[in-house]
């Protein structure tokens, strides 16, 4: 019995983009911090991380200094006493003389006669990393003049969520030094490539356009539709990934308002006059919350032949079987990595979205309400789970995953991605991350579904005797899915009851039967379709059966097809394989191969265990 129906082969594409890890590769132990402020007009270069000192007008006074800083006017810092060493000023200069009426930090006093600062000897416990009371620090942080340590004020409700410009944040997020709030850079655009049989484009000015091996000349602004794409036309477009959000309906929630604002929830408006943590419990019908999905960091491991790293402090480092001793801040380059050096980096994946059409929208209504779905207004009278047929589209997040370990060629248990779609009704178990194959009782085998798919192109004419140029045709398999195969290419089934109706002159072979004209002709020993499948693959995934993914073209690379050797068939030295179009002359088949064949060719029928052309 033969039946037909059509299902859809989905195209799964995943993108991976990661933000670089924070590191200093050119800094030294005394680099300045752009988030700090420095006295005497000194600032910090945000790129070079070095202090920029304004032109001096006269020498500086001798408050506790930092040997890591530079000072104007030839002034230097004594590393032991932590006092400034000032060159003798000119007789006419008095700009840096101290004032006995002023007070100075760290118990420094002003000599009323000489008008110079008198600095007490530093304690034995002081070090070059103690803070400086003469400096100012962000976030109301102060320096204890006695202990020389930073004192951080207790955060109030209005400042508990302020960020720190001196800190680094994942995912490319940075801290605004003025507002002390986090801001996220716009996502980087990604390039998407697809192969189509026709497309429409707008040309705003005169130009020439090449598509499907033809050149089109446009002389004025025109909307152009291209339908002639033999072999498919490749389109490339740029897209910006959308922020990934999650929407949920809750009966109560808590939120923090950092500044005065108004908030509407559950049909009520709340006025906030100051920084407040607000708890909303009155949500008749449910309050809708939208949250951003923050991807977790992933660890990426790679093996390299050489690498460069920065060591900010004395340490020991082992690489390539050798141990290196670092005695000071150093940028180190390794070129000796016999067998490769393994580097481990942490990165934040960028989230992208994929849109899918759904036929049913399901939601839970905790109490009586009305809901509008796909232009339908539904009245709910009691708490219920509601399922509504829809034609709208929903958007779900697709987060990249780390690469899975390779599995043996005979194993189907390599890790899959639940966000991807797979051909032939195959799905991915979200918990076990393994592929779930449909029952072979009512469908062709998963292997047959995968290996017989080839890129769909418009039907072409041309099957020359002895040189079988494939004519791509569409067949319907057991009401499961539609695949496209070349004229003369085999389509395998597990039993004769699964043989489909074939709309063109394409032989259908039954597994285990004598499906060649000559019974001595051996079957292929591996996959009969050695070309790649039409859906894009992921180089980070592993595939069974020795199949790999081309990192550039994103297409599957199948191992070469091999055919059992034999001496001759029907007197043909070296033999031929009818599963390979062009390898057998027309005399090999039951009937002569027509010189031309199109999509309207005669219908194939099955007789016994062999296919013949009607």
From Swiss-Prot:
Cellular-component GO terms for this entry: fungal-type cell wall
One BP term from GO: fungal-type cell wall organization
Gene Ontology molecular function: structural constituent of cell wall
Keywords: Glycoprotein, Signal
Glycosylation sites: 24, 107, 140, 213, 518, 529
Source species, domain of life: Eukaryota
Record bears the keyword Glycoprotein: yes
Signal peptide interval: 1-18
Similarity-based family: Belongs to the SED1 family.
Stated role: Probable self-resistance protein; part of the gene cluster that mediates the biosynthesis of enfumafungin, a glycosylated fernene-type triterpenoid with potent antifungal activity, mediated by its interaction with beta-1,3-glucan synthase and the fungal cell wall. Does not encode any steps in enfumafungin biosynthesis, but because it is related to a fungal cell wall structural proteins, it might play a role in self-resistance toward enfumafungin.
Name the record gives this protein: Probable self-resistance protein efuJ
Recorded name of the encoding gene: efuJ
């Amino acid at each position: 019995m033969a039946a037909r129906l059509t299902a859809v082969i989905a195209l799964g594409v995943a993108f991976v983009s990661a933000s670089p890890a924070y590191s200093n590769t050119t800094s030294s132990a005394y680099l300045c911090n752009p988030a700090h402020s420095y006295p005497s007009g000194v600032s910090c270069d945000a790129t070079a991380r070095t202090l920029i000192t304004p032109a001096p007008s006269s020498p500086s006074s001798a408050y506790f200094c930092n040997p890591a800083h530079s000072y104007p006017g030839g002034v230097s810092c004594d590393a032991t006493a932590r006092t400034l060493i000032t060159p003798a000023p000119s007789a006419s200069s008095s700009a840096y003389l101290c004032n006995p009426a002023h007070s100075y930090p760290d118990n420094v006093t002003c000599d009323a006669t000489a008008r110079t600062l008198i600095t007490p000897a530093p304690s034995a416990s002081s070090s070059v990393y103690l803070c400086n009371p003469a400096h100012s620090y962000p976030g109301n942080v102060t320096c204890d003049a006695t202990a020389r340590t930073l004192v951080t004020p207790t955060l109030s409700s209005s400042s508990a969520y302020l960020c720190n410009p001196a800190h680094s944040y994942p995912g490319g997020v940075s801290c605004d030094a003025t507002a002390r709030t986090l801001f996220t850079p716009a996502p980087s655009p990604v390039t998407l490539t697809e192969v189509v049989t026709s497309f429409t484009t707008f040309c705003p000015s005169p130009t020439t356009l090449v598509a499907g091996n033809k050149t089109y000349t446009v002389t004025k602004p025109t909307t152009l539709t291209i339908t002639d794409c033999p072999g498919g036309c490749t389109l490339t477009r740029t897209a910006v990934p959308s922020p990934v959000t999650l929407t949920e309906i809750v009966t109560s929630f808590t939120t923090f308002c950092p500044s005065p604002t108004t908030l509407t929830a559950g049909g009520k408006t709340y006025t906030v006059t100051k920084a407040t943590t607000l708890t909303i419990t009155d949500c008749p019908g449910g309050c809708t919350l939208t949250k951003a999905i923050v991807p977790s960091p992933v660890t990426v491991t790679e093996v390299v032949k050489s690498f460069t790293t920065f060591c900010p402090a004395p340490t020991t480092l082992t690489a390539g079987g050798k141990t290196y001793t670092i005695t000071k801040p150093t940028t180190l380059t390794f070129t000796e990595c016999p067998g490769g050096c393994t580097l481990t980096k942490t990165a934040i994946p960028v989230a992208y979205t994929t849109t899918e059409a759904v036929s049913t929208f399901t939601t839970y209504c905790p109490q009586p309400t009305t809901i509008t779905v796909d232009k339908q207004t539904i009245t709910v009278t009691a708490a219920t789970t509601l399922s509504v047929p829809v034609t709208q589209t929903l958007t779900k997040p697709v987060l990249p995953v780390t690469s899975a370990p390779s599995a043996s060629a005979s194993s189907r248990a390599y890790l899959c991605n639940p966000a991807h779609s797979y051909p032939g009704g195959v799905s991915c178990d979200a918990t076990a991350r393994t592929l779930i194959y449909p029952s072979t009782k009512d469908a062709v085998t998963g292997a047959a579904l995968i290996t017989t798919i080839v890129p769909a192109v418009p039907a072409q004419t041309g099957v020359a005797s002895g040189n079988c140029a494939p004519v791509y045709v569409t067949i319907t398999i057991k009401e499961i899915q539609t695949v496209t195969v070349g004229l003369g290419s085999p389509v395998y089934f597990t039993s004769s009851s699964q043989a489909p109706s074939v709309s063109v002159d394409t032989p259908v072979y039954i597994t285990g039967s004598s499906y060649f004209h000559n019974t001595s002709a051996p079957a292929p020993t591996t996959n009969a379709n050695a070309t790649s499948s039409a859906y894009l693959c992921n180089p980070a995934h592993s595939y069974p059966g020795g199949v790999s993914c081309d990192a550039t073209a994103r297409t599957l690379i199948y191992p070469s097809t091999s055919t059992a050797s034999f001496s001759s068939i029907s007197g043909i030295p070296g033999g031929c394989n009818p599963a390979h179009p062009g390898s057998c002359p027309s005399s090999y088949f039951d009937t002569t191969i027509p010189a031309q064949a199109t999509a309207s060719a005669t219908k194939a029928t099955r007789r016994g265990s062999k296919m013949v052309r009607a």
